[in-house]
Amino acid sequence: MKVLWLVSITIPAAADACGLQAKEIGGGWLSGALGGMTAAPDAPAITVASVDARAETLTVCSKNGVSFALVPTGSVENFSALLKKIAPDLVHIWGTEYAAARTIQQAAQAAGIPVLVGIQGVMVDCALHLNDGVPARLLHSCAAQHLIDRHVPGGLLDVNQARFDTLAQSEAAVLANARHVTGRTSFDRSAVQKLAPQASYYLCNETLRPEFYTPPVWHPRTFGEAPVLLLSQGNYPLKNLHTVLKALPAVLAQYPGAVLRVAGWPPLDKGPLLRPV
């Protein structure tokens, strides 16, 4: 069986196989899932596909028994050419939160290839609650901020809101045309029932990053010790760093040694224009 697995980023293994520099910090769970699948004795033949503008044309590379495909844009034409070249038995769309999900779905359906859609985040709800708790005065950017953002892309809230709204519409189209959908949570299932009532739903829990399965072994903290709070991302308001900061004084009042660690996009790496932000 041959599976074409569309993911939202070019994972490090794909960049390495195709002679590109790995540019993504995230996506460790994708690499972990790929390693787990390829290690299985009955693993299908997998081609991991992504949209990457650094690939001027359709590019297919192989390394360690895995194929990787890069398309320069997520157009129906590019994905149609990819499907013709790979001839997969199944297309697995990992996530509905990016525009390429819809176009590869269209290309696969036109070619008569079954499609499995995996929910990674329900964009319609993310868009609805993206800026919850953010003061209204911060939700609109001025012309100067938009000018700077064009040259030094940052995280303007109104720009992000427009992007999330667009992706929510694209996701709705994907799910409206889906016949098979996997999800992890009751929230996912509820969303699929509303957005894809015609689809068969499958519960599919996922792997964690490899670090969770290798030494040193992690153990829950001893009750009463000062906690270490981890926020997986703080670079956009959906993750609610602003809410955590409001609650932090109450936490510190009870646990003076508590520590908050924030992962994700570091503004200091974005150059001097964004450092004062």
Feature-to-residue mapping (PLM):
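N-terminal subdomain of nucleotide-sugar transferases
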Residues: M1-A69, I113, V251
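Active-site proximal beta-strand in glycosyltransferases
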Residues: K2-L6, L90, Q109-P153, Y202-N205
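Conserved donor-binding/catalytic core segment of Leloir-type glycosyltransferases
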Residues: L4, P220-K239, L245-L248, L260-R261
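Short N-terminal targeting/anchoring amphipathic segment
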Residues: L82-Y98, I104, P114-L116
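Membrane-proximal helix-turn-helix segments that form the acceptor-binding/catalytic region
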Residues: M123, L139-H180
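Helix-loop-beta element that forms the nucleotide-linked donor phosphate-binding surface
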Residues: A172-N177, T182-G183, R189-L208
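Acidic anion/phosphate-binding donor-loop and adjacent secondary structure
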Residues: Q193, T207-E225
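Glycosyltransferase donor-sugar binding loop
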Residues: V259-V277
